[in-house]
Amino acid sequence: MDQENQDDSGTGDLAELRKEIDKLDLRLVDLLNERARVVVRVGAAKQVDGTPVYAPDRESAVLKRICELNGGPLPNRTLQAIYREMMSGSFALERPLQIGYLGPQGSFSHLAAQRKFGSSVEYRPLADIRAVFDEVARCHCDMGMVPIENSSGGGVIDTLDGFLETHVHMCGEVVLEIHHNLLANCTAEEIKAVASKPEVFAQCRQWLATSLPNIEQTPVASSSRAAEMAAQQKGLAAIGSDLAAELYGLKVIFENIEDNSNNMTRFLVIARQPAKRTGNDKTAVMFSTAHRVGALVDVLNVFSRHGINLTNIDSRPSRRRNWEYFFFVDAEGHFEDPNFAEALAEARHHCGELHVLGSFPRATEPI
């Protein structure tokens, strides 16, 4: 009898708590729609002013503010994910955005784009990185998502070349934790071969040698293509993302098979418009140096004298003249900051060419 009373009491408490949640949900829905009505007015004002739908500085300010307001128990990362999805819905109310990315569907570029822009924008898988640059430059896509460097594999050459050959701006960055999973439509014992990109095989080398030592490895152009093949061929597994498993109807046989648990890739958002200052920015600069001894050192010393921290440097052949190189530098600050602008003006005296590729809000943690 006592047990029955306890059960009834517990059920009653749960029922009351659920009623309380239902009331809160009612208020939330009303507030979300009230916010959406204001968003529609914002969209109309942007059309009059010719302001882009997506404003990286505004996104950064909103996400920073909600974290400052957050008293818990929800972690900041959860609140940011909720607000990114709300922003995605806002974009759709103003004007549907089209985001190009390195495809096929289910690629890590696709996953990075979804984490950044949510589920209410349109996504276009493109054949290669150059196509992402071209479609943004031609106004066929509002923005593009391209990988720039991996913590294990280094810089992405095709992305650097894209900046040499097209006129687009960097307006954002995304840091994504890369977790590789073994995907298949069969059991682990039935796997006869594994498909993925060569770079992915390299990132999972130790696990594959230990767990699947005698299984054939089939290199393909992308991890998404591998998932597509695995969905069609029983006995063929793929190494790919959770998103690829969902899109292609595959089972996750083993999770997190990467050798380096701290494996991350940095992606760039590219657009036709530059981003405004936020106070916590990075700037990417591309330059070629004069043909004399010490020219590169002279350029780097300019940034040092102005107290500007360089976070990355890379180089690529210019493709215009043999043995001429373009250097790519990431630096802390915005190109419109007075000190940064002075440094750029001084650096130009030591360069054959110098181009600011864009300033954008810094990604302080993985998305």
Give the ranges of each region predicted by the language model.
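Domain-level signature for soluble enzymes in the chorismate/prephenate branch of the shikimate pathway
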Residues: 1-367
